[in-house]
Amino acid sequence: MNGVLGVGPAFPPRPFFIEAGKKQIGLRQLALRGRQLALALACMLFLLPGTASSHDASSYGGVFRSRDLGAAWLNADVGLFLNAALVIAVDPRDSSHLLVGTDLGILSSRNGGRSWVPEGRDVIIGAVFALAFSPDGELAMCAATSGVFLRNQNGWRRAEAPSSAIPARALVAGAAKDRFYLLGRSRLFASQDGGRSFAVVPGLSQTSEMTALVAIPGSADLLAAVIDSRAMISDDGGRNWRNTGFGGADAPVDMIAADATRPQRIWAAAGGRIVVSDNLGADWHSIGRSLPLPEARVRGIAASADATTLVVSSDRGVYRSEDGGQTWAPKEDNLPIHIEAGPLARDPNDAGVIYAVFSLMPYAEVWRTAVEGGNLLARIDTISLAGGLSFCVLMLIGGVLAALHLSRRRATTHSLR
């Protein structure tokens, strides 16, 4: 505020100019132009649809709920702005108790998604890809980048698990008391002490890769999995596996799912096709037609008891059919339409209630970051790095020019005195 209320030197200092071709630009002009540019950029950002302050379904990932088997959807993450919602679990004892795994840890809701609080922040670090409740709801488990964790009445604490179990693709509760199964990067682990410790399940060859896992209701040791791109069944807790004849290198299976209403029914997907078996994989038959985008990778399947209404989540969003898969419609009302959907979760007490999670960041990218230990530098591309360096150079030049200007002002003031 030089020259105001008698503050500053008696005579104005010599103005500082930057040569720009044949023109000279003073600091006041630079400041004015800088303010004009900043205002223009602010206006542009304000007008961009992706920068809306409200929770627009197209702007964020998140959690969504349907109470009518996917016909209508509403947000179940009030007050949250999630980058990557990866998995959700519903407490079988209390349907209003939800756990959501995100790229930053776990969130919990005790009122059906109307409010959320973080859990286990002192121990659970990084992306959480797997969550499970025990059948009685007394215990909860999660697998994060930082380890496998068990929650009981005393809170979250670390479980004992081999390093190869992290990160984990899936956590499922077995029908037997205190039984949990965990699918790590490619191997199967089991706990028989209520999730306090996990050990590898022998039987799978070292060259095989398991990529999906589900427990079949009604049997303590009955599991279904995707192994080497094929749908497999085990009736002894994963020690031995039977090839069901669906899938393979030419048509790799995306996922496999149990049915909420029929214990002997399992679902699978490959190449945009949805198939079902009513006898645990002894026979398969296709459901209707392929999805509109055959290249879509299916992440979850939910169906009515008569298999006429189907809901499918995929990396291309959510699809629904009301005629047994003869026609498919993408669900766009209140749901994101351009980001990936994760696995579906059904309310154990109401088969018509479904939860879906969406991630603004591709799941493959979140998984890669977890596998690599969260090295953020590995995710910086050349253009981003060049932009950052350019900004640093610009700031350095500005600092040098400001220092020169201040030096000249001081010299002028000193000479006048």
Regions inferred by a protein language model and the residue ranges of each:
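Positively charged N-terminal leader segments that act as targeting/secretion signals
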Residues: 4-16, 29
